[in-house]
Amino acid sequence: MTNLLIINEKPSQFQTFKKALGGEKGTYKGFKYTLCHSYGHLFELKEPAELVSAEKKARYSNWDDLSFYPWDYQDFKWEKRLKMGENAADAAFYQKVFSAIKQKLPGHDAVVIATDTDPSGEGDLLAWEIIEAMGWQGKVFRLNFDDSIPSIQRSFDAMTNVSNKMQNGAYLESTGREQFELLTMQLSRIAKIIAYQSDYKPNTQRIGRLKSVIVDLIYQRTKARDEYVKKPYYELKYKDHSGNIFSRKFTDGVTFRHSNKTAAEQELNAYSTSPIVIDKKEIKKQEPSSLPDLGQVGILVGKHGFKDKEILATYQAMYDKRIVSYPRTETNKIDDDQFAELLPLIDKIAKVVGVDPSLLTHRNLRKKHKTAHAEHGANRPWYNVPESLNQIRKQFGECGVAIYSEVAKAFLAILCEDYVYEKQTAHLQDYPEFKSSINIPKELNYKLVFNEDQLEEKTETDEEPTSFSASASPYIFDGANTKPSKPNKAFILNFLKRKDIGTGATRLQTLADVSQGTDALVKVIKGTYTLTYNGQVQAILCKGTMIASPTITQKLQDGMKAVKNLKMDYRKLPTSVEKIVAHDLPIIKQNAANLRLDKRLAKMKAPKPKFKDKVRGNYLGKEISFNKTWGNHTFTDLEIQDLLANKEITFQAAGKDGNRYPVSGKLAQQTFKGKQYYGFQLNKEKLQQYLEEKKAKDPNRVFCTFEGQNISFKRIWGGHRFTDEEIQKLIQGEKISFSMTSKRGSTYTVTGK
């Protein structure tokens, strides 16, 4: 019987597998098995300078010289290390988790990858990192499932042999993307160098295939709004008693839109009330909208006032409890098994979110919402149905309530009948060029549960139209060219969805990433996304580049799909970066001249520097870099020369008390939060010796032996200077008394010992 070591991605998945298979160890469908789990990625790529040979380290650690770019893919060894985390405790944790998995390996015949089956292939990559680090050379299998118990159990019937990782499309896709993203790091360095050369000081530039598209999109829309000039016009239109509007078809070059009202009023005199002729009436139906991706869930829940980061974290927590389905899915459809899984739960879900069960009469899956097979299926409520929204509120807060309500209603809507409306078209009898078309609701059906109009940028709607009246009268319509809408979440995510860039989860996650932290590229003010100083500089520098182009990003995404389907060598993804950098670097240089011309940037303040200036040089035969400053002291050229020569230097530095002290020290390799670095190391013994000598020479301190111990104390207390006689009494343990003067000028006596 084959003995399997099954690797899960995370503890929650491990617990679900235990339930599905009957325990942490055992037999299942003819296999012996042992379960273990990771905590996501345990490994990471080393820094660029650590991935190349010794003689090339200087080039790949350089942040100042543009001649070192673009990087050469062939120079990289692509080695990984256990993740370091933020501190030594983090590093120890990752080591402990890896060791626990490795200890279970002996005695097994095969390793099984049972991580998330995600669109990016990330689950396969993190599993292979562990497998390779353990030195495993045997068979490797893959289980594909959606984390439900039936799906896990079925996956053993279709286990895939992926022992040759170079034929594992998901692994290759994720590897190619990971290498691509590390190499695009050089664009961030390039942009920062050029910005600093132009005397602009962003504390970061975060250039990447999706981040750059989002930043450019916000920049272009904001710029269009800033440059908008209102151009009023006046146009003759007709309106019937029901409020329906009749107008002529507008095309460039027509003359019926007037720039002044007088001309429109003159035209109005030539027209009169006209009977309406109805051309056509027809009943039409509209199917429920597609199930929302996570980006669209973000739009819906964001309208309740919740931020992207909170939405993502809360949805993930609810998924871990199997209340909602897998967040990072790439489809908006489900298969028959996934639909059948939820059918018995429909009425219970409806009760939780307050939907009338009598509306849920369409119990067959429409073709629009159906796919032959989906690993995870669209975002939807899942098999752990809460008793009430209050139960969710207690566990996940108001954000959880909003998520469940929106996701559940969107799913329940596909169980409703089609929206039915009557489409009417009409024209004016006396002026047939004036036409109108209206849709009159007849049966709302699914729209009573979920209205997809909420996903649009603007959700304001006019009153529902009613049937045409018998006649219509002319009036002058005051119009203007449309001002571009604000760049809100719906605008950004809908644009990316139309361009088919990323999954819904990736789009929402990236939008959250660029708007977080002290080095954010974007900030959100009352639902509107605006660029920070960092983002504005990046947008200006990257205008017209390949990395900020939606078209290029789409091509890269297509390339990743080709790699996944084994139709393209994964190395073509990272090697394409050299071409992108060669194209973009001169454009970024050229765009630097536009920094001073940007009115918004001129009003912004540069953030405080995140990183200190670095010095690079040869130290003990090794190319290193270290901070050019220590405390408030900036090293001189001579001091830098001596430090690199391994000599001790001495300089005056200000202490916390405002006094200056002689400080001595040398360069040394040190460790901070688990990470090694080179920097100035203080000679603490010399400083302590100086302070003691200074204290001994201080005329305002007394040095003596008191109760058998050598001590010192200040000779001045509250403005009173102890006399020699008083000092002798204090040393002998006697009380002394002396006069003091208060702030009000009165005299009082102080006694003490």
How does the language model describe each region?
Residues 9-12, 38-40, 110, 116-122, ...:
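An acidic- and aromatic-residue-enriched active-site/binding cleft used to recognize and process polar
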Residues 93, 99, 106-107, 152-240, ...:
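C-terminal or mid-to-C-terminal helical accessory/interaction module adjacent to the motor/catalytic core
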Residues 20-24, 104, 133-137, 158, ...:
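Conserved, well-folded catalytic cores of nucleic-acid-processing
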Residues 1-186, 464, 471-473, 479-483, ...:
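Intrinsically disordered, low-complexity regulatory segments
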Residues 2-3, 24, 109, 165-166, ...:
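Basic, low-complexity terminal or inter-domain segments flanking catalytic cores
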Residues 19, 34, 41-90, 103, ...:
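Long, highly charged, low-complexity internal segments
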Residues 99-102, 184-192, 271-275, 289, ...:
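Active-site-adjacent bridging/hinge elements
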